[in-house]
Amino acid sequence: MRHARGYRRLNRTHEHRKALFSNMAGSLIEHEQIKTTLPKAKELRPIIEKMITLAKRGDLHARRQAASKLKEDKDVAKLFDVLGPRYKDRQGGYVRILKAGFRYGDMAPMAIIEFVDRDVSAKGAADKARLAEIEAVEDEE
């Protein structure tokens, strides 16, 4: 029987799962949309929902709690400066999961997880900025 089985193990140790979801949460906060397997997306949703709730609180203790779950300071900054105010009036349901077919190779069910009122320009913004910087350096030479 599967009574009181609260989460998916995803064939990983506790430390590996913790690192996986920390990395995935950071990627979702940075890009506002990521593609992953359906079970990972379903497990990531409550983690992100709790992060947004912390960001809506906005105090120092909430910031430290979020920083303990995320690996990079820029993700914490975006969470509290951009995403928290964006979802101030929304009572939950900050992310959506869209099914995206099956992965070639192992037929794993794929999903796209994204923020509900996401900024479309956020996905790939870092890459575009980096390429523009490289192009500017090449033009100077």
UniProtKB/Swiss-Prot annotation:
Ribonucleoprotein recorded as keyword: yes
Keywords: Ribonucleoprotein, Ribosomal protein
Protein origin, superkingdom: Bacteria
Pfam families, per database record: Ribosomal_L17 (PF01196)
GO MF, one example: structural constituent of ribosome
Keyword Ribonucleoprotein attached: yes
GO BP term (any one): translation
GO CC, alphabetical: cytosolic large ribosomal subunit
Family that this chain belongs to: Belongs to the bacterial ribosomal protein bL17 family.
HAMAP family the UniProt entry points to: Ribosomal_bL17
Subunit comment: Part of the 50S ribosomal subunit. Contacts protein L32.
Protein name: Large ribosomal subunit protein bL17
Originating species: Ruegeria sp. (strain TM1040) (Silicibacter sp.)
Gene (name only): rplQ
